[in-house]
Amino acid sequence: MGDALAVSLMQMRGFTSVDFARLHPGGSLGRRLLMTVGNVMRSHDLPVVAPDCSATDMIHAISKGGLGLIIICDGDRIEGIVTDGDVRRAMERRRAEFFNIKAADIATPNPKTISADRKLIEAEKMMTRNKVTSLLVTDAAAPVKLPT
């Protein structure tokens, strides 16, 4: 009964989820609606490798990075990403040839990216819509970062 009264009062006063988030910024709704990707991105110790990275080095970099992926960069240019799933699928398909492949051979080109100033809820929606678990955060000052 109390919930029904609260909802009715909120509707009568035009009280929105954004209003609630502003009054309760520490809650999960407030965090998602008010925080930006820049507030939660990982910008250090990213698992970045060159396009010619070997299969063995890819596995090591994915394990060490702790994110389930590596970022393939040629200088400051993002060439793609390789996930632990990409590595598993390549092992199944290529079997004996697997250890001859390079990162560029199995990389997903044009990974999903987002700007650091976007709201966290936008990043969550984008990840859900694209069925991915990570987004690269790009901007002119720092071309590669990851929301954590």
Where are these regions (language model features)?
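Bateman (tandem CBS) regulatory domains
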Residues: L33-L46, N100-P111
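Alpha-helical scaffold segments in soluble metabolic enzymes
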Residues: A4-S8, R22, N39, D57, ...
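The conserved cystathionine-beta-synthase
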Residues: V49-G66, M91, T113-T133, V137-A140
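Short alpha-helices
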Residues: M1-F15
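A glycine-centered beta-loop-beta connector
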Residues: V40, I62-G65, I70-D86, M127, ...
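A short, polar/charged loop-to-alpha-helix boundary motif
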Residues: V87-N100
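Cytosolic regulatory modules rich in charged/polar residues
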Residues: G14, A116-K119, P143-T148
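Internal, active-site/partner-interface "lid" segment
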Residues: Q11-R42
